[in-house]
Design a protein with these regions (language model features):
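Bacterial Sec-dependent N-terminal signal peptides
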Residues: 1-24
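Extracellular/oxidizing-compartment recognition motifs
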Residues: 21-389
Length: 389
């Protein structure tokens, strides 16, 4: 009997050992972001997690290698930085290698030792630097020449050609106000209400996008739509943002940096060659919403086939602040769709949809009707005495 118990114990011990999950290094991040582009920090912080399910598991050492060539990193070589082995449990480490250059992709990995001092290497990750200084901008700040009281949102466009094969392309856009960026009719990125709020007369944020796949051989077009955001409050409310010292008509600056397969680089900047016009958004306020007149839509306005002969020239604007830097945080995004949980008809013109919870978001509706019909959407957190929003 004792022999059978011993065999049974040995059997389960073997199962336990063989079933151990191998040590893995995961969630590699640069400045807390997953493979970011457009970093401005000259000493970005690199972080990771060790997955080790064993009791008493601990990291006993780390070593980081950084190089411009991913193959070198795979082979454990870091010409930009080889930290050497550090007997430490740290999993957040500031870069301490050679000076990083703007517009450059750097690959990196980490090699860690576990509690048994066995080494495990992570997959290769990367980060990509951005402007790293205002002196590298080529674009000028431009606007539509209107004042702070003008209601319609400004649309901007620029056509250009690519005569060679494109290796990569990055769009860098800074705005005072809000923006949406389009290339060849496609909205770029999944950002909402970008860039994020700052004290606009002291600091402005730019966002970098990989737009390689959006470019096409030959004719191309860029489109930018600006909104007032927190920069130009046309609605009076709490906190007196309508009297903010930075208040002005929205403006932006953009560099589209194209790298060709032959190694040459071309930049399409904002300048006086851009064109501007108004469109379907006749009013926008971060407090009181948006007025959209579908009769004023300019279909295809961000495509190269669009006729912009009725559009007008842009105007130069002064830089809102002397500090234009990368937005190195997670953006606002649409992350979940909430369908209405109930519906109630109040009268022939009023309907109430209840989504079952409080949230921040936008409403998506599909409507049809006679041209010029006005549809109003009002959001609220509670109903009044008449059970109306």
């Amino acid at each position: 009997m004792k022999r059978n118990i011993l065999l049974l114990f040995t059997f389960f011990a073997c199962i336990t050992v063989q079933g151990q999950t191998p040590v893995r290094l995961v969630d590699l991040r640069s400045e807390h972001l997953d493979r970011p582009i457009g970093l401005d920090n000259p000493v970005p912080r690199l972080s990771w997690r060790m997955e080790d399910g064993r009791q008493g598991a601990v990291q006993t050492s780390w070593r980081i290698v950084v190089d411009e060539d991913s193959l070198n990193v795979v082979n454990g070589c870091g010409r930009m930085w080889d930290s050497g082995k550090n007997d430490s449990r740290n999993q957040l480490v500031a870069y301490a290698g050679k000076k990083l250059q703007p517009f450059t992709r750097y690959y990196w990995k980490v090699i860690c030792s576990d509690m048994e001092y066995k080494e495990t290497a992570s997959p290769v990750s990367y980060f990509e630097t951005g402007m790293m200084g205002m002196q590298h901008w080529q674009g000028a700040w431009i606007g539509d020449g209107k004042d702070i009281h003008y209601g319609p949102a400004p649309y901007f466009r620029k056509e250009f050609k690519t005569g060679k094969k494109v290796k990569s392309a990055r769009a860098y856009i800074a705005a005072a106000g809000l923006y949406e960026l389009y290339i060849n009719g496609e909205k770029i990125g999944d950002h909402c209400l970008a860039p994020l709020y700052t004290r606009f007369d002291r600091r402005n944020l730019y966002v970098a996008y990989d737009v390689t796949s959006q470019l096409q051989n030959g004719d191309n077009a860029i489109g930018v739509l600006l909104g007032n955001g927190w920069y130009n409050h046309q609605s009076k409310a709490v906190w007196d943002f309508d009297r903010a010292p930075w208040r002005n008509r929205p403006t932006f600056c953009l560099d589209l940096r194209i790298t060709y397969t032959d190694g040459s680089v071309e930049t399409i900047p904002t300048d006086l060659s851009w064109r501007t016009a108004s469109g379907a958004i006749t009013f926008n306020s971060i407090y009181t919403g948006e007025h959209y007149d579908a009769r004023l839509e300019q279909k295809g306005w961000s495509t190269p086939e669009f006729d912009d002969s009725k559009w007008r020239g842009v105007a130069y604007r002064s830089v809102p602040s002397s500090n234009v830097t990368a937005q190195q945080v997670h953006p606002i995004r649409n992350v979940k769709i909430f369908p209405a949980v109930s519906f109630r008809k109040v009268d022939e013109k009023t309907y109430i949809y209840d989504f079952g919870q409080n949230m921040s978001g936008v409403t998506c509706i599909h409507v049809s009707g006679e041209r010029g019909t006005e549809v109003r959407i009002k959001h609220g957190e509670r109903l009044d005495r008449k059970s109306v929003v």
